[in-house]
């Protein structure tokens, strides 16, 4: 229904918004649900526990750390949506994080581990070992572990050491019987569990069974060999998460690469934001000391009933997956893209028609070939590309280096400020420069998050430009795991736009003219605000307003308010938001025409797609940008239209299939809570599985 003027609602009311941090925790809870879901293969459930832990580590290192910094600085202003102060946010985060970690450990200990045991995969403690296994593990400790360990004594001359971020440590309380005075008899030693050693040590076992013991269990059992002459009183396991957000002062920075390299060294030693302690064998005296030394409070301390740092379960997954194929997802192989058919030459096909790529259902290899073939083609004069996150052994990097070595003009923007990929990107920037590429580090005070490649070719005396645009990174590894779109075109206007875009990045150009591209921080928000306004106008005139928007996160208040206006005008809005969503749907007179769903499953939903009905003249945009304030204001992003009618129909069908998912979809209610979509006896639709089946069918039909 559309509101009358006398019925105006205050769209700034905090009751209409979810807090960003709490909404993110709700997303990670959906990841944890995948570990609890018994329809998922057992080892995949193990992997989801690992992903949950890894996500939470980063959340504490960045988001919680930032809130703590605000509190320390005396900043107590409420955030602009849900109206929570930093202190209130920290309190609510602590309650929810404790609850989620308790559920995580309960899932691991009470469900996943027993199920693994039924398959012959069993965790043993030192006390469970047979005589043969004890002999094996003692020899293993003496030869493989002991030489790597550094026992650190704590006393007046050797203060409590600075312990690495995310490191697992053993606090060993020792008793010295030789001391006369009782107060001098208790000593403390710290042993850091080396991250370079295998966390899971597999033991001699009968038959097809795989029994293992954890590295920290082994070290704990032999601490007397590290502190000879003392009696081991207790061994307490603990792990510290530190503030790891980089502070980069770009003003006056002559060499951004050196500034970032310097800051990276500090990341290991930031203030403690979380302390995890193993419940088993915990010593209250050690715990009291850790509180004091690390300056943590009760809400920062997580006493867990199980092994600390469950990110390690990913390495266990990788070890066991090849041996237990029935416990992992059935293999699904990315198919040849339907827009390429049997064509060998991507460039000649792009001259015929635009090419749409849908990963991981369709192979990422044509994107690699696009750069590799350009490097090998003697007619290619220049290659320009933005890189945000790439794989550890990137074929695209290798192709760019070859192109430069062959004398082509190669310009690469390597975003040095890509969080937790800074070190990797510094390495690639140096390597590309050494190969002869012109490397630029981005735009001051902005992260270049756009995904674009331009190839310039001279053939038969004519200059041709080919452009690849994407919603995801140029990363051949994650392209097998993330859902994303790629688009290759030889349209002249797109080529001109790409040239202008790269000139903006590399020079002193102010906002250039674009035919089709919208670029943040210039005008992406304005573009989408205008498109929503148009949809409102069309709905008032024709009654058929309809918007579908798919993204990773939705936090931008101006865009949220604009969608509330669309809902109030009667426009139907369907949002597919995998992660954080600050918008609340279903609120009478505010958002009753908005539906919000989140799909969390085998593949990480990563594509950004924006659909507007436009009174039948449908408009579809793909983008590198989510509807987040940082994407609108603090990043260089690209949004681009799909012009081909068949391509638009294909993307719309994919959106509709995703909205019909009733297996991996959770829907948000007006209170901000998420619930599984009820199947109600209809056909089960897992959109990701169905998209893979469609890709296979397209290949078979060719």
From Swiss-Prot:
Mg(2+) binds at residues 389, 419. ATP binds at residues 55, 482, 578, 606. The keyword Cytoplasm does not apply. GO terms for cellular component: polyphosphate kinase complex. An intermediate of this reaction is the autophosphorylated ppk in which a phosphate is covalently linked to a histidine residue through a N-P bond. It is an enzyme of class 2 (transferase). The keyword Ribonucleoprotein does not apply. It comes from the Bacteria. Its cofactor is Mg(2+). The active site is at 449 (phosphohistidine intermediate). Coiled coil: none annotated. Transmembrane segments: none annotated. GO terms for biological process: polyphosphate biosynthetic process. It catalyses: [phosphate](n) + ATP = [phosphate](n+1) + ADP. Its EC number is 2.7.4.1. Keywords: ATP-binding, Kinase, Magnesium, Metal-binding, Nucleotide-binding, Phosphoprotein, Transferase. One of its GO terms (molecular function) is metal ion binding. Belongs to the polyphosphate kinase 1 (PPK1) family. Catalyzes the reversible transfer of the terminal phosphate of ATP to form a long-chain polyphosphate (polyP). This is Polyphosphate kinase. The gene is ppk.
């Amino acid at each position: 229904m559309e509101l009358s003027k006398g019925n105006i609602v205050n769209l700034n009311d905090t009751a209409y918004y979810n807090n960003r941090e709490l909404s993110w925790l709700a997303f990670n809870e959906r990841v944890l649900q995948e570990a609890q879901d018994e329809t998922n293969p057992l080892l995949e459930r193990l992997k989801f526990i690992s992903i949950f832990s890894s996500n939470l580590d980063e959340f504490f290192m960045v988001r919680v750390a930032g809130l703590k910094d605000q509190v320390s600085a005396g900043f107590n202003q409420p955030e602009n949506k849900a109206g929570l102060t930093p202190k209130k946010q920290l309190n609510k985060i602590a309650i929810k994080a404790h609850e989620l970690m308790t559920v995580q450990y309960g899932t691991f200990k009470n469900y996943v581990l027993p199920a693994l045991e039924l398959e012959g995969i069993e965790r043993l403690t030192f006390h469970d070992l047979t005589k043969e296994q004890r002999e094996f593990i003692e020899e293993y400790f003496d030869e493989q572990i002991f030489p790597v360990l550094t026992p650190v004594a704590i006393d007046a001359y050797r203060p409590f050491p600075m312990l690495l971020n995310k490191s697992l440590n053993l606090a060993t309380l020792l008793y010295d019987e030789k001391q006369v005075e009782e107060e001098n008899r208790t000593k403390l030693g710290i042993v850091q569990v080396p991250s370079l050693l295998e966390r899971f040590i597999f033991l001699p076992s009968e038959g097809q069974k795989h029994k293992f013991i954890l590295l920290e269990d082994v070290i704990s059992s032999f601490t007397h060999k590290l502190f000879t002459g003392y009696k081991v009183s207790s061994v307490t396991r603990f792990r510290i998460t530190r503030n790891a957000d980089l502070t980069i002062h770009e003003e006056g920075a002559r060499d951004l690469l050196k500034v970032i390299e310097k800051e990276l060294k500090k990341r290991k030693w930031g203030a403690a934001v979380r302390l995890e302690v193993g419940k088993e064998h915990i010593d209250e005296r050690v715990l009291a000391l850790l509180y004091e030394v690390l300056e943590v409070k009760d809400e920062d301390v997580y006493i867990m009933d199980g092994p600390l740092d469950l990110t390690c379960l990913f390495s266990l997954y990788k070890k066991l997956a090849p041996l237990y194929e029935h416990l992992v997802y059935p293999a699904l192989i990315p198919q040849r893209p339907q827009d390429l058919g049997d064509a060998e030459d991507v460039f000649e096909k792009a001259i015929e028609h635009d090419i749409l790529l849908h990963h991981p259902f369709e192979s990422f290899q044509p994107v690699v070939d696009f750069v590799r073939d350009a490097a090998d083609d003697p007619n290619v004069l220049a290659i320009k590309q933005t890189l945000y996150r790439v794989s550890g052994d990137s074929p695209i990097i290798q192709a760019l280096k070859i192109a430069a070595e062959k004398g082509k003009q190669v310009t690469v923007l390597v975003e040095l400020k890509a969080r937790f990929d800074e070190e990797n990107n510094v390495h690639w920037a140096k390597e590309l420069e050494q190969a002869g590429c012109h490397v630029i580090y981005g735009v001051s005070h902005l992260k270049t998050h756009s995904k674009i490649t331009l190839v310039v070719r001279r053939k038969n005396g004519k200059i041709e430009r080919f452009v690849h645009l994407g919603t995801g990174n140029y990363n051949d590894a994650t392209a097998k795991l993330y859902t994303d779109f790629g688009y290759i075109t030889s349209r002249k206007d797109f080529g001109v736009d790409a040239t202008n875009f790269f000139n903006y990045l590399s020079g002193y150009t102010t906002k250039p003219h674009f035919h089709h591209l919208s670029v943040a921080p210039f005008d992406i928000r304005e573009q989408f605000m205008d498109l929503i306004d148009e949809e409102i106008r069309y709905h008032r005139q024709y009654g058929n307003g309809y918007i579908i928007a798919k993204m990773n996160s939705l936090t931008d208040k101006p865009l949220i308010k604009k969608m509330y206006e669309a809902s109030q005008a009667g426009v139907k809005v369907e949002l597919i938001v995998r992660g954080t969503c600050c918008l609340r749907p279903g609120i009478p007179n505010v958002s009753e025409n908005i539906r919000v769903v989140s799909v969390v499953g085998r593949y990480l939903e990563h594509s950004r797609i924006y659909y507007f009905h436009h009174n039948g003249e449908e408009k579809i945009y793909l983008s590198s940008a989510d509807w987040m304030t940082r994407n609108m204001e603090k990043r260089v992003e690209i949004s681009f239209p799909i012009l081909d009618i068949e391509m638009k129909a294909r993307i719309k069908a994919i959106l509709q299939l995703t909205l019909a998912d009733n297996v991996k979809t959770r829907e948000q209610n007006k209170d901000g809570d998420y619930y599984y979509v009820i199947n109600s006896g209809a056909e089960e639709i897992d959109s990701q599985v169905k998209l893979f089946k469609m890709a296979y069918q397209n290949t078979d039909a060719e």
